[in-house]
């Protein structure tokens, strides 16, 4: 969260983007926890973020402009198209800013983090702090000789769909874990995005949708292990499993 906040201003204020940006953190689970972090010196952060120099100022008699009014139908679609172009531009800006941040911090970021994914047959895809729990389960399963891995998403918008699909294309099956309900009777928002892009590149990877941790409910290594076992049984034994299910429901 700390590192992402430092990068956020540079991304949002870039002349090719100029869009709002949100940094999301697991409420209570990490926001009320105590953990060591490595802070950067203030002067380094200030130099990295820099000063915002707008291309146009609010009061300019030579170029009068309106800021903040709603767009009516003659202009609305064009404004939406411009926002979409800015969102496309944001992908490269995010990577460029991350490269610059790595130079002052030694910490490199991309659209997502891969954990033991390069040779994995089965993978979990998720966002947020629960990835740490999944990593513990992966380490234990790897010790048993099982090829499992994790893809932890860092950037949700613009969605790096093609990059994620290519990173997962070699796997036999993936479990997509959403900590939010999409209310479409078929999985959460992350699930919908990833399945679409796996289809687009023609990947043979099977994808199963899961919902977990709603309302801050705990997610355990036992549950992560069970998800991996379900994927393996589906592929290796031909077992039919629900393609959309909740983890950790009270019976």
Locate the predicted segments by residue.
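Short acidic, glycine/serine/threonine-rich loops at helix termini
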Residues: 3-6, 32-39, 136-137, 163, ...
């Amino acid at each position: 969260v700390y590192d992402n906040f430092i990068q956020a201003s540079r991304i949002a204020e870039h002349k090719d983007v100029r869009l709002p940006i949100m940094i999301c953190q697991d409420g209570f689970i990490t926001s009320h926890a105590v953990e060591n972090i490595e802070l950067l010196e203030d002067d380094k952060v200030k130099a990295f973020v820099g000063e915002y120099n707008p291309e146009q100022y609010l009061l300019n008699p030579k170029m009068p402009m309106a800021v903040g009014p709603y767009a009516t139908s003659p202009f609305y679609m064009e404004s939406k198209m411009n926002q979409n172009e800015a969102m496309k531009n944001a992908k490269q800006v995010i990577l460029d800013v991350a490269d610059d941040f790595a130079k002052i911090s030694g910490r490199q970021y991309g659209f997502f983090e891969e954990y033991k994914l390069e040779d994995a047959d089965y993978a979990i895809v998720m966002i947020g702090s629960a990835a740490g729990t999944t990593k513990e389960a992966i380490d234990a399963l790897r010790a048993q000789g099982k090829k499992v891995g994790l893809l932890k998403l860092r950037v949700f918008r613009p969605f790096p769909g093609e990059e994620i699909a290519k990173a997962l294309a070699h796997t036999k099956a993936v479990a997509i874990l959403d900590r939010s309900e999409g209310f479409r009777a078929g999985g959460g928002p992350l699930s919908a995005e990833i399945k679409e892009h796996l289809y687009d590149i023609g990947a043979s990877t099977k994808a199963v949708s899961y919902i977990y941790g709603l309302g801050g409910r705990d997610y355990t290594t036992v549950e992560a292990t069970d998800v991996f076992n379900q994927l393996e049984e589906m592929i290796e034994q031909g077992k039919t499993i629900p393609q959309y299910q909740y983890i950790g429901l009270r019976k």
